[in-house]
A protein has these predicted regions:
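Alpha-helical scaffold segments
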Residues: 1-466
Length: 466
């Protein structure tokens, strides 16, 4: 089986016919099942075979695929009872919205006899709003609590008022968390009720604090950094923490909205290049205020600039400014979150950034393509050379030349390119490192796909083997 290294790639080939895919599926190879489940489309015969496959792992891959048709995923509910849990959990890809299941599937899942299935369904990020809104009046408190957490913004004032006065304390707390920023009384109640909860710090940071409560929290010395981040914490009390021994507390004080640049500079704060900081809430809440964003983008304070960088409303002049910021995280956040991030910023971070997130920048719509062949075809860095095939003006001759590059990543990029001559695609199937990429090429003749399977010893008779 000298070419078995290339066989997996056929599972991702958009031109592979059902017969080829069914032969692959019969191998009971989990990686092949994964690649099949993530195809943009599946022939009906292959979809049916995966739905009814005796191996639970194959069905699970289908249930967890963000690319699989929601109707197809929902039909797993007609199979073994154990599949309901993976259907309920569903796909949860990073920063991607997954199309929801059909309503009938949610009805079955939310009325399932197993509590774990109901729980996973309620907490699945893909459950649509219209399914969750009616739960605000559900007889079972956990359902009302979920409605508070997930769709508060979609509830009417009357429904919200009812939830704020709900007989169940967990429901009341979930509702109160949404109004505490403007309600001192509910903030005080939450501080008492959640004193030993992980949500205590959230209340300290976001709740509306009366003077007496603020002074008590300061005196207790608990959660001082979240307390200092709360804009409702009186400025005169916050100033007492400016010289605190804990650097996290000093940093929180230095990033408060009422401070001038001079007042920030007077505090001994530090933000390291690897420090992970959440977006300052007061900046995010003011993201439609151009002047606030401009003040943050031009601040000497790193945290303010990082917070401005994630705001899509950041004005164009500030985008240009932060694209050249000396803090790597500022540039990366801008590249990740701003719809008008400069193409050259995306390219520079992709080639020179060390954070794992830079690899995802290449899929951004504004990632450059034109001119990359002339710039990088002969670059010493293989990551740069691989970009040359993104250039729409790259010639078939150049793509073929890159398909013979000593670097595996460059050869793989060329192997997937539609301009690569079919003759060379077939040759690359024998490449132990780039053969799998070549097998994904849509111009690969079906006869070559079949021949590859034959050489690899993949049985021609399709059968499910448990």
């Amino acid at each position: 089986m000298t070419t078995h290294h290339a066989v997996h790639g056929l599972a991702s080939n958009p031109a592979a016919p059902a017969g080829v895919l069914l032969r692959l599926l019969a191998l009971n190879d989990e990686w092949i099942a994964y690649r099949l489940s993530w195809r943009a489309s599946l022939p009906d015969e292959v979809a049916e075979a995966m739905l009814t496959h005796p191996d639970r792992r194959v069905r699970q891959r289908l249930a967890e695929s963000a690319n699989a048709d929601p109707e197809l995923r929902a039909r797993l509910l007609d199979g073994p009872a154990s599949d309901a849990l993976v259907v309920a959990h569903g796909p949860q890809p990073y920063r991607t919205v997954v199309p929801p299941l059909p309503d009938w599937a949610y009805e079955r899942l939310l009325n399932h006899e197993r509590s774990t299935v109901r729980y996973e369904t309620l907490h699945s990020p893909s459950v649509p709003e219209h399914v969750l809104v009616p739960f605000a009046g559900h007889t079972h408190p956990p359902f009302r609590e979920i409605a508070c957490r997930r769709v508060w913004h979609a509830l009417t004032d009357d429904v919200r008022a009812a939830l704020l006065g709900d007989e169940d304390p967990a429901v009341r707390r979930a509702a109160a968390l949404h109004v505490m920023a403007d309600d001192e009384g509910r903030t005080t109640e939450l501080l008492e009720a959640l004193a030993d909860s992980r949500q205590f710090q959230e209340v300290v940071e976001r709740g509306r604090l009366g003077r007496a409560v603020a002074e008590r929290l300061l005196a207790e010395g608990k959660a001082l950094a979240p307390l200092a981040r709360n804009p409702a914490f009186p400025a005169d009390l916050a100033s007492r923490l400016a010289g605190h021994d804990d650097p996290a507390v000093r940093l929180a004080v230095s990033a408060r909205p009422e401070l001038s640049e001079e007042e920030r500079a007077a505090i001994d704060w530090e933000v390291g290049p690897e420090d992970r900081l959440g977006t300052l809430r007061w900046v995010w809440d003011a993201r439609t205020d151009t002047e606030v964003l401009r003040r943050c983008a031009t601040s000497a304070h790193t945290w303010l600039r990082r917070s401005a960088a994630v705001c899509p409303e950041l004005p164009e002049d500030c985008v240009r400014l932060l694209a050249g910021d000396g803090d790597f995280a500022v540039r990366l956040l801008l590249a990740e979150f701003h719809p008008q991030a400069p193409p050259e910023l995306l390219l520079d971070l992709y080639l020179h950034g060390s954070h794992r997130a830079v690899a995802m920048l290449i899929v951004k719509e504004r990632f450059p393509a034109a001119g990359l062949a002339a710039r990088f075809a002969g670059a010493p860095d293989p990551r740069a050379r691989a970009l040359a095939v993104r250039d729409p003006e790259a010639t078939p001759e150049l793509v073929e030349r890159l398909s013979r590059d000593p670097d595996t990543g460059v050869r793989e990029a060329a192997a997937r390119d539609p301009r690569l001559p079919v003759r060379r695609v077939v040759e690359l199937l024998e490449d132990p490192e780039a053969g799998s990429a070549a097998a994904t090429h849509p111009a690969l003749p079906v006869a070559e796909m079949v021949a590859l399977l034959d050489r690899a010893g993949v049985p021609a008779t399709v059968e499910h083997r448990p």
